[in-house]
Amino acid sequence: VQSALDDISLEIARGEFCVITGASGAGKTTLLKLIFREDVPSSGQILVNGRNVSLIPRGKIPFLRRTIGVVFQDFRLIERKTIFENVAFLPRILGLDHGRQKRVAFEALRRVGLSHRMASFPSQLSGGEKQRVAIARALINEPEILIADEPTGNLDQDLSLEIVRLFLDIHLRGTTVLFATHDRVLIESVGHRVLTLAHGRLVEDRPSRRAPAPALEGSAAVSGSAEGQLSGDLA
């Protein structure tokens, strides 16, 4: 059986912006799933802030995911709910009182420039606006790590660059960002570290062209190694 990832070993520092690239099927999505514990490696380990996420009991996985925001290519918005309701959904599930739900949802939408569209429905938004809502939803818990899996795949070049600038702004606030894309224009515009995967292997680790940021205490580090066929669906 062909491995989804084979002999991957890397470390991502606190507060780092890291681009993960490679052709379709190279292993980008698989690597990201390992980090937020949607999959587990058949061998090796994934450490987030020094903790082996593969050993986290099923009932504790939601606590890990409260520290990790995830943005997908397909937005995953609830069409029958307003933008505000989409973003406030997680705080409601977590049991925040109504006033707190409103405050954190408004702040998340404000950060992505959509506080004026709170009453709109997803069908009334452009693709770029929908992705901004998805980013706001991922930011709702002030995550230490923000994972983006091909977040611009359905957008044109101008909108894609706009979304990249938003991720760069989020990174400047101290968030560790893992950004998967195969778009070379976006990769060069970011200028940060680039990990290139091919056939499940790490074939290049290009350092950032930007000046290093100061050490950060409030963000998260990711390190580890993984190989072999992945098993489990713990979403």
Residue map of PLM features:
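Short coil-to-helix segment of the ABC ATPase nucleotide-binding domain corresponding to the Q-loop/switch region
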Residues: 81-89
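Conserved ABC ATPase signature
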Residues: 121-125, 129-131
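Helix-to-loop junction immediately C-terminal to a conserved catalytic motif
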Residues: 36
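Catalytic Walker B motif of ABC-type/P-loop ATPase nucleotide-binding domains
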Residues: 146-149
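Conserved ABC transporter NBD signature motif
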Residues: 44-52
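ABC ATPase NBD coupling module
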Residues: 2, 53-69, 170-172
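Conserved catalytic motifs of ABC-family nucleotide-binding domains
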Residues: 142
